[in-house]
Each structure stands twice: as structure tokens, then as C-alpha cells.
Amino acid sequence: MSADSENETSESSPAGEATASTSALPDEPLILLPVRNAVLFPGMVLPFTAGRGQVKEDVQAAVKRQQPLGVVLQRDPRVQDPTFDDLNTIGTVANVVRYVTSPEDGAHHLICQGVERFRLIAPVEGLGFRAARVEFLPETTARNPAVDARALVLRQRAGEMIGLLPNAGGELVRALDAIELPGLLADTIAGLLDIPPERKQEILETLDVCKRLDKVLDAVAGRIEVLRLSQEIGEQTRGRIDQRQREMMLREQLRTIQNELGENIESREEVRKLTEAIEAAHMPPEVESHARKELGRLERMPEASSEYSISVSYLEWLTELPWPLPAEAPIDIARARQILDEAHFGLDKVKRRILEYLGVRKLNPHGKAPILCFLGPPGVGKTSLGQSIARALERPFVRVSLGGVHDEAEIRGHRRTYIGAMPGNIIQAIRKAGARNCVMLLDELDKLGQGVHGDPAAAMLEVLDPEQNASFRDNYLGVPFDLSAIVFVATANQIEGIAGPLRDRMEILDLPGYTEAEKFQIAQRFLVPRQLEACGLTAAQCELPDETLRAIIRDYTREAGVRSLERQIGAVFRYVALRVAEDPSTHERIEPDRLSSILGHRRFESEVAMRTSLPGVVTGLAWTPVGGDLLFIEASSTPGGGRLVLTGQLGDVMKESVQAALTLVKSRCESLHIDCSNFDKRDIHVHVPAGAVPKDGPSAGVAMFIAIASLLMGRAVRSDCAVTGEISLRGIVLPVGGIKEKVLAALRGGIKTVLLPARNAPDLEDIPVDARNQMRFVLLETVDDAVREIIEDESVTSSRNVDI
């Protein structure tokens, strides 16, 4: 069943003042017509369409018996087949004035005239149609001053409301004036109102005429307010449109007058400058044609238009880009070597590769050179290497920071249709450099993110691919720009963070951490002079002896790079600067024993001997994104049921390494002289300190084996040894990565002997010579080699001894 409330006003009309009679008797059931979204008032005429199956039968029964219908509103319009409980209790008795069946869809169209109110009493079942016992509610015709006064006000307010309707005529006002009964007047006006069916039902259920008039008055007042507000909004909108059209017409007339008088100097000057800039930019023909077309649009555009400034900004971007390729300076390899040696200490392998790169470019300037990616921990000189390449090539240097970039538009730019659109970071950097053959450093390439606005790493593929970047198209520019002459250099901390397709387009150069000797040389050559200048001091005012500098490196920093070292040196010089500012004649010599009063207590000290003085404690080596580090592993045994307890936030790989190590120890009880008959009566607890730091990796197997074996043998591990390597269940020591970083970490921690897999022997060539000379390396084929080398021969008498 559907009843469209939008059709109510079009076919509603007053039916007169006399109370209509009905052929239904109070003791006969009344056939019900449930409706969804319309309320029929007494005296009103409404069209209905019966489309639901049961409702069709109800209508047919009423027409066949020539009986009236009980039109009643459903409580929930979503109910398809309403029951007695789904209907409101008060409805309107209606006579069927007209009835037509549609041949297309079989729907029943009928026009009903409301007669009087009724109240549902009880449903009547078994008739084949929906019917109910009802109680008629005849309209009271008693008149009193209160009712008459409200009726008069309602008549006036209704006329006011009709006057605000856009297409209402005087016939409706005259029809309302002809109604004398106040109750019928209220019903008629309520039926005309555009208010929700629930509110109309509330008025229908108000039997007291005085209260009904009040409710209709409130509804009419609300509609008047809405109509007035709508009228005001419409007038304001029309006024704004008219004003805008008037202003546009006046501006066009003013522009015509100014053109005739030659007074439009400012915009003409701007167009003239852009025309000259296009001619001087030496753009490719395709780009120049596009720019002149945009300039023509600009000349025809009103200066006050919002598009005017956008077009000017776009043309400025096009003309300020370095389109022609400048002449390249010849590459001087000797000068390049001198620049690299002056700016960087150590890094011989990396500097040699950069010189090879420059040599190839000198011999084949038009060849497709590889893209170098400097990979290493923070503070080892990745960015400064890019600057040195730019100095050696005598090209401008520009840096593009990619850390945290998660929107593809930051690489390719935004389309001009967006408010505040700008070119991407690549084009912006080229304009900043002022040359199409600049050296561009893509910093923190491994920190590229990925969000809902696309994948920036995928956008970088077009930038770095030599086959595509000759016609790179920025979304803002909309024209191709040649990036093939740019020397791209990238930096990253972790290779895992670089997308695979990007890695394939680059040559990775590892920059390891510095040794203590290298840090000392870097501090003397670069950091100390730089911090002296930054603090406004001279060498005569502050003296930093070699012993003090080594103490700062050893006791106050422990990093792969030198940034923290530079901060500590700066803190010392700032302390001296304060003294000099107070007394210009001051000369300070900072001895090592004064560092504690300036920098505080020592932050790092060697604790290897203390940690490994007991059985079950071994020093392992770990690799981190910021360099190598020492990893202490502790094992202990307690009475229990043979459980293995692991703590220290170990990852899945390390947990499996401990399981494999324990199994290997059990399988070698005889050779290790361990009584394994009580394994099921003891729990073994393996702990890696610094439990707040997650740890994982495939290189702790040998260290785990040594820790458990040392514990069960009751023998301590040598305090000057550290070990790395993975194991198999056959006891074979497997190779691992990060050897150089791990060895340098051992050197910083005071370790003199490093045990590592024999298959990692070629990696020792990457370790600086001075570091190799200070250490002893033991190559392991099996875990038996590690036991012989690192576990002391004599048992330690301690409460930690375990007899299993």
C-alpha cells in the first residue's frame, strides 16, 4: 500500500460544513485501509493507490459491498503487511468517491472523502479482509468565545501562509473563508500543511476542538517561519547573482575603456613580462606551444577572476624552470680525489667507487650512469658524500627529503584543479637548483611511506628509471620534463625499507661505522675546528688534548657515526665560551679529569669482565640499523620439570636458536662432560638483558650454545671474547651478516678476541686495517672450536655451578 503525501494538496478540497453520514453502523465491522504516509481528515478528499495484496482485497471488499473504509495510518511505514497492533487507534471513516483499476500493474486507484473520526476497538477475524469493531467519534458543534477566537486567528494566519506560497491562488483563501465550523476548519488546514504524517496523526487524535485549533496554529506558525526564511534566502541568492553579473559587466566595460585609453598598464606589463620570460626560457617546442596557449587564455581572462592568479602562477613556474642543458665542466679526477679526502676520513672503498663513477662519466658523458645509494647508520657522512660529488662535478647540489612522504602527489605534484596546487618535490628542487644537470640527493629513501593517496615509491620509479625519466610528467606542469641529466644520489639507513623495484635501479654502497681511531682523526680534522668556530673561540682560548678527546670518544659516545661526538665536543666548548665571555683573558686546557664536571658522569664503561665472570654468561654480537652492538646472554638453572624459559623480548628466530642450542648441548653431553640424567628435573632459563628492547635475528645460535654449555659445565667464558654465528643441529657454524659492524662494536666495547664463522673470513677484508691489527679473530667450523677457544678449562666454584 502506498499513499503519496505529495499528492494531498493537489487533490484535497473542503467537503462542506455539515456532518456527513455513513452507511456503516456501529455494530458492524468497518473495513480498514492501512496507509503509510498520509492522514485523511474529515471533510477532505485524498487519492490513494492500493498496491499490496491484502490491501487490494480490503478495497475490493469495501467497493463490492458499497461500504465505507476506515483509513488509518500505520505506526511504522516499513511494515508491508500490517496487523491490528501495527495501526494507530484513531482513523477516519471515508466514502469511496471514485475507484479505478490500472490494467498495467493491477493497482487499485481510489479517491476517498473523509467523513468522521473513529477509534479501533478490536479486530474481526475470518472475513477474508481486514476489518475491526470501531467506535465513531462525532464532531462536537458547540461554540464558545475561546473556540471562535482561535478559529479567527487561524483563518488569518492561514491566509498569511497561503500568501507566502509561490503558486497559491485566491480560490484557496475563499474556500477556507466558506468554512464556518471551527473543527472542520482546523482539519482542512491541517490536511493542507506540509508537515510529517506523525504530526498530522497527532492533530487527528486531538478530539477537543480548542486544543486542536492550538496545535494547527502552532503548525501554521512554523510553516510561515520556514516560508519566510526560504523567501529571504531566495531573494539574497538572486541579489548576489544579480550583483555578480553586474560587477562582471562593469569590469568588462572598464577593461574595454582602459584598453581604448591604454590605461590597463599593470596587467599589460604582467603579460609582457611573461611573454619575454617564455621567449628567454628556451623551452622545447611542445612546452613553448603549451605556454603560449596558456598566455593567450590569460590575456582574455578578467584580472579579477579567480583563475587569473592561478594561470599567472603556472606560467611563472614554467618560465622559471631550467629548460636548457648547461655546458658541463670537465671532470678533474685528481681534484675530485682531493675533495673527497679533505671532506671525509676513511671510507676508502666508498671513495674509490665514487672516483670510478666519475671516471666513467668523464669517458662517456652521455652514458647511463648507475644511481648510487649510500647505506649506513646515521652520522657516517652519507649526505656530505653527495655534496662532495656535486663539488667534484662543479654542479649545484639540492637535497630532497623523503622521510615520512606518504602521498604520491608530493613526488608527482597536484593537478591544477586543486586549490593551492603545487609541483612535486622533484620539480621544486630543480627550480631551486637552477640547473637541469644538478646533483640531487634523495635523502632517507627507506623512510618512504604508503597511504591512501597512492604509493610514493612507485612514483619514484619513473624518476629514477633512465628509460622513463627523460619524459617525466609532473601533474601540475602537465608537460614532460627531462630528468636524464640529473645525477641522482640516494641515502638510506636500512636496505629492508627500500622497495624491491627501487633497489633494482640503484647500486648500494655500504658505509660502516667508524672505529675509535677514525673518530679521533675526524674529530681533530673536522669536528673540533667546526665547533670552535660555532662557539666563537680560537685555539689559543681553548685547548683539547688528545687524551681528553679519546676520553670523550670512549666514555661519552658509543655510536657508529660522529654526531653524538660532535655534540659532546660542542658542550665542552660552550662551557669554555661562558668562561671566556666572563673573562676574555681566559685560557682553558680541558684535561680528562675535568670531563665529569662538564659532561657529567661517564655514560659508557666496559662491563664485559664483570658480566662474563660467571658460568652461563657470554658476550654475543648484534647488528642494528645504527651499527653493531654487544649482546649479553645469560643462562641459569633451577629445580623444575625440564622446561626452557626465555625472557628479554626475544623474537621467533632467536627462540628457535635457543631451542636448537639446547638440543645440541643435550646431544653432546658426553663430549662436554655434562651429566644429562637430570635434565627433566631442572629448568633452564635463558635471558637477554635490556628486556624493553625487542631482539631477533639469525646470528645468536653459537652464543646461546656457549651460554648453556658454560652453565652446565660450570666453567666461565673468557671475558675478552665475543662470538657470533648460527648453528645447525649437527654442530656446524653457519655464516651471518653484519660482520664489520659487529667487529667494530666489539672493539668499542673492549673485546680483544672475536669468534666468527669460518665462511665469513672474506668479510674481514672490509674491516679497517687498524681495527684488524688490534684484534684477534678465531674462525669456527663447528661448535667444538668455540668450546675449546672461549670456555675456560678450570671449573668455577660458585653457587652458579650446576651438577646435572
Curated annotation (Swiss-Prot):
Cellular component terms (Gene Ontology)? cytoplasm
Its recorded reaction(s) are: Hydrolysis of proteins in presence of ATP
UniProt GO molecular function: ATP binding; ATP hydrolysis activity; ATP-dependent peptidase activity; sequence-specific DNA binding; serine-type endopeptidase activity
Enzyme Commission number: 3.4.21.53
Against PROSITE patterns, the record matches this protein to:
LON_N, LON_PROTEOLYTIC, LON_SER
Task: Give the binding site residues for ATP.
Answer: 376-383
Q: What conditions trigger expression of this protein?
A: By heat shock.
Record: active site:
699, 742
Q: List where in the cell it is found.
A: Cytoplasm
Cite the InterPro entries for this sequence. AAA+_ATPase (IPR003593), ATPase_AAA_core (IPR003959), Lon_bac (IPR027543), Lon_bac/euk-typ (IPR004815), Lon_lid (IPR054594), Lon_proteolytic (IPR008269), Lon_Prtase (IPR027065), Lon_prtase_N (IPR003111)
GO annotations under biological process? Answer: cellular response to heat; protein quality control for misfolded or incompletely synthesized proteins
Q: Where is this region: Disordered?
A: 1-23
Entry keyword set: ATP-binding, Cytoplasm, Hydrolase, Nucleotide-binding, Protease, Serine protease, Stress response
Q: Per the database record, which ranges form the Lon N-terminal domain?
A: 30-224
Domain (Lon proteolytic) ranges: 612-793
Fetch the Pfam families from UniProt: AAA, Lon_C, Lon_lid, LON_substr_bdg
Briefly state the protein's biological role.
ATP-dependent serine protease that mediates the selective degradation of mutant and abnormal proteins as well as certain short-lived regulatory proteins. Required for cellular homeostasis and for survival from DNA damage and developmental changes induced by stress. Degrades polypeptides processively to yield small peptide fragments that are 5 to 10 amino acids long. Binds to DNA in a double-stranded, site-specific manner.
Family named by the database record: Belongs to the peptidase S16 family.
Q: How does it assemble?
A: Homohexamer. Organized in a ring with a central cavity.
Identify this protein by name.
Answer: Lon protease
What is the protein's species of origin?
Answer: Paraburkholderia phytofirmans (strain DSM 17436 / LMG 22146 / PsJN) (Burkholderia phytofirmans)
